[in-house]
Design a protein with these regions (language model features):
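Intrinsic-disorder/low-complexity regions
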Residues: 2-3, 36, 78, 127, ...
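Electron-transfer interface patches adjacent to heme c in soluble/periplasmic c-type cytochromes
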Residues: 50-54, 85-90, 94-95, 99-214
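Post-cleavage N-terminal segment of exported redox proteins
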Residues: 1-64, 182-214
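Sequence/structural segment immediately N-terminal to covalent heme-attachment motifs in c-type
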Residues: 59-93, 177-178
Length: 214
């Protein structure tokens, strides 16, 4: 075989490789690559953004959600055994001795009067109650109660929970309180202490109102 023939065959093989690569790129684009670059991730995989950096309502948390963590609740485990315990117990989510993952609760945190002007945001954010609020909010996926671990774990929704099944269904009264909290953040552009969130109570008083769930 002459040198010329060998060079010709190598050139043809290289050209076939280039054509195959181009076809592969076009194939990726036809599978939903989107955008000007066919190797980019499709638009449908982009994470949604929150509008106005919304926050959950602190007033509703401290009056309605936090007390749930201290309730003696019946629990069912996968092996069929049952028990009665609190979420804030020392073996669960207690801030000092808990073993229940990142979610932590200070059980004896005291409520704060949000109608008292002396309780400024800085003072509230330094309190134990706010630490509980901050920890609980970290277990929330905005806009999704089923993806929020603060509900998904005690309901065993596609995730393990060492504390067993706490809420049988989304209709559990305590689960409904947490759902309402997740689904009703403070209005966009306001902070977690906004008086607009007081409508989550009937009457709209964070100190005396009852906790709405719908």
């Amino acid at each position: 075989m002459t040198d010329y023939t060998q060079r010709t065959r190598r050139s043809a093989a290289a050209m076939r490789g280039i054509v195959a690569a181009a076809a592969a790129v076009l194939g990726l684009a036809s599978c939903g690559g989107g955008g000007s670059n066919p190797l980019d991730n499709p638009d449908s995989l982009q994470n949604p953004t929150l509008q106005g950096n919304q926050r959950l309502a602190f007033a509703y948390f401290q009056r309605c959600v936090f007390p749930i963590f201290n309730l003696q609740l019946p629990i069912r485990f996968a092996n069929g055994t049952t028990a009665v315990n609190t979420c804030a117990a020392s073996g669960c989510h207690d801030n000092a001795n808990g073993t229940g993952g990142a979610f932590r609760v200070i059980p004896n945190a005291q409520p704060i009067d949000l109608t008292n002007p002396a309780n400024t945001p800085d003072i509230i954010r330094a309190s134990d109650m706010y630490k509980n609020f901050y920890s609980a909010q970290g277990e929330v996926v905005f806009g999704s109660t089923t993806l929020s671990r603060i509900l998904a774990k005690p309901m065993l929704i596609n995730v393990l929970h060492g504390g067993g099944l706490v809420f049988d269904s989304a209709q559990d009264p305590n689960a409904k309180v947490i759902q309402f909290w997740i689904n009703n953040p403070a209005p966009s552009g306001t902070d977690e202490f906004s008086s607009a969130t007081f409508t989550m109570f009937t009457p709209a008083d964070p100190n005396t109102g009852t906790c709405r769930t719908q």
